[in-house]
C-alpha cells in the first residue's frame, strides 16, 4: 500500500465524525485534499465548510460544498486537518503548505480537532524529520531569522512563497522541540512572527493514522 492510499484510508475514516447539518472545519494539504473528496460524497448531509486555505476553498467548491467565512461562524463541531509531524501527545508540526496561521484560526473555532495522517508522520520528538515553519511579516524576516538562530535553529527563507495573508515563511531546521507548548509560546512572542507551526496549545483530540493494515484511531 502506497502513501496516497494510506492518506485516503485516514481521510475516509474521518467521515464518521461528521454530523448532519453541521459546518465542518477543513485544513489544507494533500491528506486534507483526500478528505475533501470524501466529504463530497456526503455533501447533502452537511451545511458546508470553513476552509483554512484558498486552495481548500476551491476544492470544496468543486465538490459542490458551500464555503463559509470564519467570521460568520461562532463555532465548529469538528476541524479536520493533516500534519507534517505528530507526537504521541497529539501535538503537531504543520505549515508545509504555508497555511499555518489560517489553520490555527479555524482549529480554534472547533470543539474537536481530528488529525488525519499516514504512518510516516508519527515521531517521538517534534522537529525530528521536518523543519518548523514560521510565518513572518516580510519586513521582519532578517531579524526574526537572527532570533531563531540564537535559539539554536537554522532558519531558511522559503523562496518564492507568499502566504494567503501576504507574509513569508522561514523554515527552521535542526530544531529539536522537546517542550512544544513553551516553544510555541516563546516563538509567538517574537516581534514580527505571525505564528509558528507548532500546534501544541491546541493539539489534536483524535488522530486517525492510515497504515497498511487500515485506519487506526487514537483518541
Curated annotation (Swiss-Prot):
This is Ribose-5-phosphate isomerase A. One of its GO terms (biological process) is D-ribose metabolic process. Homodimer. Pathway: Carbohydrate degradation; pentose phosphate pathway; D-ribose 5-phosphate from D-ribulose 5-phosphate (non-oxidative stage): step 1/1. The keyword Isomerase applies. It catalyses: aldehydo-D-ribose 5-phosphate = D-ribulose 5-phosphate. The active site is at residue 103. Belongs to the ribose 5-phosphate isomerase family.
